[in-house]
Amino acid sequence: QFLDPDGSFPNHIPNPENKEAMQSIRNATVNNKADLGLIFDTDVDRMSAVLANGEEVNRDAIIAMISAILAPDYPNSTIITDSVTSDRLTYFLEDVLGLKHLCYMRGYKNVINKCKELNNAGVVSPLAMETSGHGALKDNYYLDDGAFLAVKLVIAVAKAKANGKTIDSLIEKLPPLVEEGEYRFKITTEDFKSYGKN
């Protein structure tokens, strides 16, 4: 859908975090009876997905799904995420997949650089990903590349189908989301860094 390039984006904002954009891909996925729907931002460094039933796979769930794909090849490894992930993701990564979860500061460069730092120190870290859908894989030289992540998902769909399953089986043990919200507080002091440390 919307395959004709138009830099004014007349259909919706090209953003996996935008509700209108997600509703559009949900409708397209369900109406076309697709196994998976994929959505990217304008420069394709962020992505999100929609299951065949229209369920959105974003935020914690997209990190969980990519981690589940990587877990067999990287047992006991460390997944680096931004600081706004939930306890349900930590539970899934650690208790279900047997991985480690390092919840780090926001900013995709911070998450990616921490992942590189850990790998250089001998701590296997195959994935750095933010809840925004911004992700980088060790397998892809830590480039923030939504298309590479999407290919991983498409391969997982094919493997699941070959085994009589659907891709959502990868995250069936991810606890349901109770409530989600992001709040931003205005900090009025000039020295905001030291304010944040207190």
Language-model-detected regions and their locations in the chain:
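Self-splicing inteins and homing endonuclease
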Residues: L36-G37, T42-N53, C115-N120, V124-M129
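Short, charged, surface-exposed secondary-structure boundary motifs
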Residues: G7-I13, S67-L70, V111-K116
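Buried hydrophobic positions in well-ordered alpha/beta secondary-structure cores of metabolic enzymes
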Residues: M22, R26, L38, D43, ...
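Gly/Ser/Thr-rich active-site loops/lids in small-molecule metabolic enzymes
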Residues: E55-Y74, G146-V154
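N-terminal small/polar loop signature for handling phosphorylated ligands or for N-terminal nucleophile
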Residues: Q1-A49
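Short hydrophobic/aromatic-enriched beta-strand-loop microsegments
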Residues: Q1-F2, E56-A61, G98-R106
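Short Gly/Thr/Asp-enriched flexible loops that form oxyanion-binding sites at enzyme active sites
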Residues: D45-A64, L89-T90
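Phosphate-binding and adjacent anionic-ligand microenvironments
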Residues: Y74-N198
